C-alpha cells in the first residue's frame, strides 16, 4: 500500500502532462509537454529550449523519454526535436543535422555500457558514447518492416525494441544479429491465439529483466521467457485495461503496468490496482487474484493524480508515477500489498 503525494504546475511541475519519470538517486527527473523537470531537495527546477544557446540547451520542450548513464551520471533526454545530454549542468543537443541520430523525434532512450540506444520515428540509432560513432538501424539492415520505434530496453546480452505496428525487435549483443517477434495470428482487432506469441503488433514499451521480456501493447501485455509466451488481457487478469503505455519489471515474476485506467502491479499471484475511481474520482485501490477474480476493495485516502498512467520508476521502496495530469510519488507504508 502507498500513500500518494501529487505534483502539478500548482506546486512546481513544469507541465501537468507528464510523459516519463526517471529516478537519479535522491533526484527525480520528469519529462513533460513543456520542459524537463528536476525535483531535488524538495524544490523544482525546469529546463526548456533557449534559442540563444542553440546546441547547448534542451532540444525541444516536449520531453518524451529519459535515461541515466550510471557510469557517468549523465542524463539523456529524448524529445520531439532531438536528443539532449545533461552532464554536470551542461546541456549538449544532438539532431539529424549535427549527428547520426536517425530522426529528431526520440520516443525512447537507453544506456548500456558505452552505448546509448535511441528509438525514433524513423528507426533506431546507437551512439558509442566513448568514441562518438553512430550506427543506424532501419528496414535496410534489420527485420524492421515498420520504422516507428517506440521504446528500447538494452542489457548486457540483448537489446529489445518496441516497434509501433511492427512487434518486437531483438538484437543479440554477441552475434550482432537481429530477430523479430510478431503477433502470430496477424489479427489487429482481436486475439485469436492467446499464448502462441506476442499479443499484438502495436507495441509501446518493453522491459527485459532476469532474462524475461515483458511487453506492453495497446491491446494487452506479454511475458516471454525465451521459450514460452504468456499474455495478459483485462478479461482474464487483474489489468484494469488492455491499453498500456509502459511496462516495467522488477524481476522475473513481478511487474508494474501503466494503463489508461490505472496503475496495476502483478506479483506473480495477485494484482493490485491504484487509481482515482473512474466514476467518482475518489481514491481507489483494489486487489484480485491472478485471473482478475475475488476482487477486494482496500480503503485508501490518496491515489495517483490521474488514472491515465504513462510510466513509472522506483526510488527504493517508493514509486514515482507519470500521469496525464501530474506526477505522483507513492510512499510505501509498512503494511504494503505491493513490495519492491
Predicted regions and their residues:
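Carboxylate-rich, polar loop motifs that coordinate divalent cations or form catalytic acidic clusters
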Residues: 1-340
